[in-house]
Amino acid sequence: MLKVAALYQFTPLPDFRALREPLRELCAAHAIKGSILLAAEGINGTVAGTPRAIDALVSELQTGALFSGRLNDLELKFSQASAMPFARLKVRLKKEIVTLGDPATDPTRAVGIYVDPQDWNELIATPDTILLDVRNDFEVVMGSFEGAIDPQLARFGQFKDFAAQELDHRKHRRIAMYCTGGIRCEKASSYLLSRGFKEVYHLKGGILKYLEQIPESESRWRGECFVFDDRIALGHGLKESRQASPVMDGAPHDD
């Protein structure tokens, strides 16, 4: 059984271009495959390998000399795969690690209020809470939380247009949002706060952490959670979907 790690952190990496090759070499040395994005604003990736290989990579990212302690708050989610879910290893340089297209939005300055999975059901059941799914439309089709609004985004960058047209900080006082692993909510919640919204919450660890920690008997989630690798989707307990698909490139949620 292989170990899959979804990881990200918003943190200044002015030397991100110089980090690309040593990071690629580190992953290759451990036969790790998947995709990692580097940008001046941080790191975002999903990778797979043996448990020992993934543990070695995570240890280096968090405490090794390569990032010099800048990833000590790395957001991590682990799951399993019965076979290698990625075709190759890619370490890419990007303008953003998740593409919103608004340079003024900075999650290192302000983000919404994190809500642990154990407290999520109570929040979304609260009257007047607007529940937003900030994933792409093809992901929402496979599963969502009961009562969630689907903004019908073809790509994450369209969230700005949705917010401008459909959300009003004077009318929508409390907003709760979620995504696969949490990274898109970091950007989306930061964006809404900069537009005058006061109460913005997001699911800590995303859908994946919720499915890992919340028993199916207590869950408000319906369907499966799409993931960007050959497993296609995960269910409660992070069990692999039975749906078949060709091996994907393993692109993390950058758009």
UniProtKB/Swiss-Prot annotation:
CDD domains: RHOD_YceA (cd01518). This is tRNA uridine(34) hydroxylase. Belongs to the TrhO family. One of its GO terms (biological process) is tRNA modification. Gene3D superfamilies: 3.30.70.100, Rhodanese-like domain (3.40.250.10). It comes from the Bacteria. SMART domains: RHOD. It comes from Nitrobacter winogradskyi (strain ATCC 25391 / DSM 10237 / CIP 104748 / NCIMB 11846 / Nb-255). It catalyses: uridine(34) in tRNA + AH2 + O2 = 5-hydroxyuridine(34) in tRNA + A + H2O. Catalyzes oxygen-dependent 5-hydroxyuridine (ho5U) modification at position 34 in tRNAs. Residues 125-219 form the Rhodanese domain. The keyword Oxidoreductase applies. PANTHER family: RHODANESE-LIKE DOMAIN-CONTAINING PROTEIN 7-RELATED (PTHR43268:SF3), THIOSULFATE SULFURTRANSFERASE/RHODANESE-LIKE DOMAIN-CONTAINING PROTEIN 2 (PTHR43268). Its EC number is 1.14.-.-. One of its GO terms (molecular function) is oxidoreductase activity, acting on paired donors, with incorporation or reduction of molecular oxygen. Keywords: Oxidoreductase, tRNA processing. The active site is at C179 (cysteine persulfide intermediate).
